[in-house]
Amino acid sequence: MNIKAIAKEVLEFLIYLIIMVAAVIALRHFVVESFRVDGHSMDYTLQHDERLFMWKLAKIERFDVVVIKAPSDPSKRYIKRVIGVPGDTIEVRDDKLYLNGVATDEPYLAEKVKEYQAANPNGNFTQNFTLAQVAGASTVPEGKYFVLGDNRQNSLDGRSFGFIDANTVEGEADVSYWPLNRLEIGRAHV
């Protein structure tokens, strides 16, 4: 091989490398990003230090687990479950979620609620509330969501900070990849 042929191969390799790096950066910035769970507000579904992929282009729906900018400090991020979408009325009464007046199952909490009720027959895993009591409005406004942590007794969520703006949702967290024993697609969506 002559020097020209080697230089051509090196240049081709560098071009491919630059394209690959640019593609990875674009994917991370616009499509998917890794996220580490920091804290216990989603215990029972997600664990502290668990690693997830966050899909930035996902259409957010009720019960999705999402990464949001913290209302009090946008440089921080929280992970919560979307409970209310625009137009919803929400109430929790005697550990039952009522969406638009209809009792709605929360399978992601069922086991923990049973355990809690067995140990605390006169207590509620989730304290009773209405949307009006905690957020100051009876329905979720357009362009907003109402979010809760799955660890209802230890979560800074919509009961404290009210509605979140839809534009503060960074993406849906739906694929757990670390630790490997928790590797699963869609588990957070249960």
State the predicted function of each range.
Residues 12-30:
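Hydrophobic membrane-insertion alpha-helices, especially the h-region
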Residues 43-47:
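Membrane-proximal juxtamembrane linkers immediately C-terminal to transmembrane helices
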Residues 10-11, 36:
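Hydrophobic, membrane-facing alpha-helical anchors
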Residues 2-10, 30, 48-187:
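Soluble "head" domains of membrane/secretory-pathway proteins
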Residues 24-42:
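Aromatic-capped interface at the extracytoplasmic side
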